[in-house]
Swiss-Prot record:
It comes from Emericella nidulans (Aspergillus nidulans). The gene is cob. Gene3D superfamilies: Cytochrome Bc1 Complex, Chain C. CDD domains: cytochrome_b_C (cd00290), Cytochrome_b_N (cd00284). Binds 2 heme b groups non-covalently. This is Cytochrome b.
Amino acid sequence: MRILKSHPLLKIVNSYIIDSPQPANLSYLWNFGSLLALCLGIQIVTGVTLAMHYTPSVSEAFNSVEHIMRDVNNGWLVRYLHSNTASAFFFLVYLHIGRGLYYGSYKTPRTLTWAIGTVILIVMMATAFLGYVLPYGQMSLWGATVITNLMSAIPWIGQDIVEFIWGGFSVNNATLNRFFALHFLLPFVLAALALMHLIAMHDTVGSGNPLGISANYDRLPFAPYFIFKDLITIFIFFIVLSIFVFFMPNALGDSENYVMANPMQTPPAIVPEWYLLPFYAILRSIPNKLLGVIAMFAAILALMVMPITDLSKLRGVQFRPLSKVVFYIFVANFLILMQIGAKHVETPFIEFGQISTIIYFAYFFVIVPVVSLIENTLVELGTKKNF
């Protein structure tokens, strides 16, 4: 017997990435898992390297980043890889979630996998926010001040929580130290969650497929077929990432963060990184501070209710015309929210933001269940007519 199948550790690896039987009809939309694992690997390696040269201090943080850029061998490359792979990570995660919503990956028996995936998204957002504060430019300082201040919306204990997070009465050395410690820790938590995500998927029925039906009658081993298929998208990913890192490394960043943090001067507009903009737009679209914070967190957790609100008898929207139209409206609405999150709080962006927020929540709690019931009824009527 081969050592791969007899060794206690290697046989686990073998069962997951070598002999694992995958549906033969998987499209390239099922390649995001390997790309996201690659992104996480790049982030951990570049992050640990950056941590060796970074100083989490109000007076030295900005200078230590400049030191990495100017004095450390290939420090500029490590930093730009880290910042641009973060954007790639979120871009691929949103595509991964979109594919899951389109093909009904949240339905039984993959509900646990979907729930763990939602937790991964929340941890990713927390990690990204903590990391954005560390260079300690203008946007870092004011972004940290604005986002941590959201906790003050909690009745009675809000302000105490904010000061507990800061470790003082404003963003200071203690804040940077704890943000750095947590930013260093959370990627390893992410890796553990990703492993749980994989185990939850493999220990139920494995990957879904574009048809949304059982693929037990036609499967192929993961190696060499799907490893080669994954390698194709990995090479494309490296080409695109290299274009950003070498030719436009700051295209997805904010120029304000190249100005050293100054608590006495507020930047013209305080906006987070592009991948957090839709949720920032939802936060700003509700005038009440507490309700805005609740809505922002609810917007992420809304993904958790999809297994409950989708009442369709079919998995996915690929064979459901009404749901397909509604899904594409939801995607367009999400992109509109992303644009509005970057705009100033003024007319007409306030009104557009409020309309888009209503559409966003309506999709999960109203539109999906209503449309799926209509489609179920039409299918049943059609079936009775044929028989």
